[in-house]
A protein has these predicted regions:
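Membrane-embedded alpha-helices of multi-pass transport/permease systems
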Residues: 2-6, 52, 96-99, 103-106, ...
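Phosphate-binding active sites in nucleotide-utilizing proteins
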Residues: 89-165, 175
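Interhelical loop and adjacent transmembrane-helix boundary motif
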Residues: 2, 8-43, 47, 79, ...
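C-terminal transmembrane helix and the adjacent membrane-cytosol boundary/short C-terminal tail
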Residues: 36-77, 156-163, 229-240, 244, ...
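Membrane-interfacial helix termini and adjacent extracytoplasmic/periplasmic loops
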Residues: 8-13, 67-73, 107, 111, ...
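Cytoplasmic-entry segments and transmembrane alpha-helices of multi-pass inner-membrane transporters
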Residues: 75-84, 154-191, 348
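N-terminal signal-anchor/first transmembrane alpha helix
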Residues: 43-50, 71-100, 170-176
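Transmembrane alpha-helices
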Residues: 1-3, 85-95, 178, 182, ...
Length: 348
């Protein structure tokens, strides 16, 4: 919430936020120094909360009971009905907002001319990138999903299953948690200051799709890493010992054991990265070029230009794409994974 950028920019009006100040200083006034100062102020609360959470987690870890039995609560029909109604009201309110946006994207001129049209989806007379920006987002999301999932899985596997010095292991574990405490705006500014220097050999990456993919993977690295680490920890170490006894290579063990057993987590991580890559704004707003404009950035640009309905139409495209990917993931998990993951049921 503290570092949110998209919502305050669209509906915040004159109510100022630190995230908006960063954007105004860098994009509006080209004042990189002041933008960096505000970014540090924006970073401090997140770092303090992150450190506090780590201290509390270590403190509570000493009192964990590892041999616990699941608690089965007594059935309370009245309470269940009340909670179901409450959840239904909240879900209905969210769906109503989404339905309004979907309906508005098909209306000729809201709320004056309510005739239906597809003209807003042509993006022919609006700035922001149009369909090119949408396909850039899909391409960037696919690249981030493939390379990000592969990289994160390799790092998690090397950290958990291969012998390494305790210092290196602790350093990697601390490093992968760092993006969770760093706001996307701060990451974006850091990328500008580093990659935009002409003397930097990596300057060729600035303004390309590659830097957008890298920033997206780094920004959303922590949650997938923790997910895959937890999946790897569920695999018994005895399987490694058995494979070593049989003379099986590490590559074959990875291909025949780790990859199939971690496949559900890999699918979850892939969907997580894809959806977040489709909707990312905070870091990408500083890194895109006219050739690599993204759909989420195009929504902000269209809204700034007064093309609100076109911005809504682009938002619906992003939402639809994410929902389709999630639906494919759900069907794949339901149909195929049920057969490939029978070992989990037999182990209980």
């Amino acid at each position: 919430v503290l570092t949110d950028f998209g919502i305050p920019k669209v509906i915040g009006g004159s109510f100022n936020m630190m995230a908006l100040d960063v954007y105004k200083q860098i994009i509006g006034q080209q004042n990189m120094s002041m933008g960096a100062v505000i970014s540090i102020l924006l970073l401090l609360p997140a770092v303090f909360v992150f450190i506090f959470d780590r201290i509390q987690s270590k403190r509570h870890a000493r009192f964990q009971v590892f041999q616990a039995k699941p608690y089965v609560s007594a059935s309370n029909k009245k309470l269940e009905v009340v909670l179901s109604l409450f959840c239904g009201v909240v879900s209905g309110a969210i769906l109503l907002i989404i339905f309004t946006a979907v309906l508005a994207s098909f209306i000729q001129s809201w709320p004056y001319d309510l005739s239906l049209t597809l003209a807003h989806y042509s993006f022919e007379y609006v700035d922001g990138g149009g369909w090119a920006a949408y396909f850039n987002s899909v391409r960037m999301a696919l690249f981030s999903t493939v390379f990000g999932t592969t990289l994160i899985f390799m790092v998690a596997l090397l950290t958990e299953r291969f012998k390494a010095h305790p210092f290196i292991k602790n350093y990697v574990q601390a490093l992968v948690l760092l993006p969770l405490a760093v706001p996307g705006l701060v990451l974006g500014i850091a990328y500008i200051l580093f990659f935009n220097q002409q003397s930097n050999p990596l300057n060729v990456l600035y303004g390309t799709m590659t830097i957008l993919v890298i920033s997206t993977i780094v920004h959303y690295y922590t949650v997938p890493h923790l997910t895959l680490t937890n999946a790897i920890k569920q695999i018994p170490l005895q399987l490694d010992q058995a494979a070593q006894t049989l003379g099986t290579s590490k590559w074959k063990t990875f291909w025949k054991v780790y990859l199939p057993m971690c496949f559900p987590a890999l699918c979850d991580v892939s969907v997580y990265i894809f959806v977040n890559a489709m909707t990312t704004v905070s870091a990408a707003i500083f890194l895109y070029s006219p050739d690599t404009s993204l759909a989420a950035v195009a929504v902000l640009n269209m809204d700034d230009a007064g093309d609100t309905v076109a911005a809504v139409a682009m938002s619906i495209l992003i939402l639809t794409t994410s929902c389709v990917v999630k639906l494919i993931h759900w069907l794949f998990t339901r149909k195929i994974m049920a057969r490939s993951q029978q070992w989990r049921e037999s182990s209980h």
